[in-house]
């Protein structure tokens, strides 16, 4: 009865494509799926708005986001960790 609760929140890994808004980053998540009829591998992508409280993530960073309560009309995700820093130009 004292088992640890399993997290039911989804986590995704994606690339930051915009950091222009205050405390918000736009994350592009790409996934590859096999077409049901033809069998070809197809790349699908989705953009998510994630909450970045400190403003520490910038364009090009690869980050992990976790599902959360609605923060605003379009923001339901929170940045949890940095996976890979963007290369300096």
UniProtKB/Swiss-Prot annotation:
Q: Where are the transmembrane segments?
A: none
Please name the PROSITE patterns in this protein's record: RIBOSOMAL_S17
Q: Which domain of life is it from?
A: Bacteria
Gene Ontology molecular functions: rRNA binding; structural constituent of ribosome
Q: Keywords assigned by UniProt?
A: Ribonucleoprotein, Ribosomal protein, RNA-binding, rRNA-binding
Gene Ontology CC terms: cytosolic small ribosomal subunit
InterPro entries given for it? NA-bd_OB-fold, Ribosomal_uS17, Ribosomal_uS17_bact/chlr, Ribosomal_uS17_CS
**Database matches in Pfam families:** Ribosomal_S17
Where does the signal sequence lie?
Answer: none
Which Gene Ontology biological process is one annotated for this entry?
Answer: translation
Matching Gene3D superfamilies, A to Z? Nucleic acid-binding proteins
Subunit structure as annotated in this protein's UniProt entry? Part of the 30S ribosomal subunit.
Which NCBIfam families is this protein grouped with? Answer: PRK05610.1, uS17_bact
Name the family the entry cites.
Belongs to the universal ribosomal protein uS17 family.
Tell me the function of this protein.
Answer: One of the primary rRNA binding proteins, it binds specifically to the 5'-end of 16S ribosomal RNA.
Q: What is this protein called?
A: Small ribosomal subunit protein uS17
Which species is the source of this protein?
Polaromonas sp. (strain JS666 / ATCC BAA-500)
Lineage here is:
Bacteria, Pseudomonadati, Pseudomonadota, Betaproteobacteria, Burkholderiales
- This chain is encoded by the gene named rpsQ
């Amino acid at each position: 009865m004292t088992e640890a609760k399993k997290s039911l929140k989804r986590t995704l890994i994606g690339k930051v494509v915009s950091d222009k808004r205050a405390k918000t980053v736009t994350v592009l998540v790409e996934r590859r799926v096999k077409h049901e009829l033809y069998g070809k591998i197809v790349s699908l992508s989705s953009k998510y708005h994630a909450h970045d409280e400190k403003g520490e993530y910038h364009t090009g960073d690869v980050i992990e986001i976790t599902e959360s309560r609605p923060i605003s009309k379009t923001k339901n995700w929170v940045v949890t960790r940095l996976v890979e820093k963007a290369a300096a130009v």
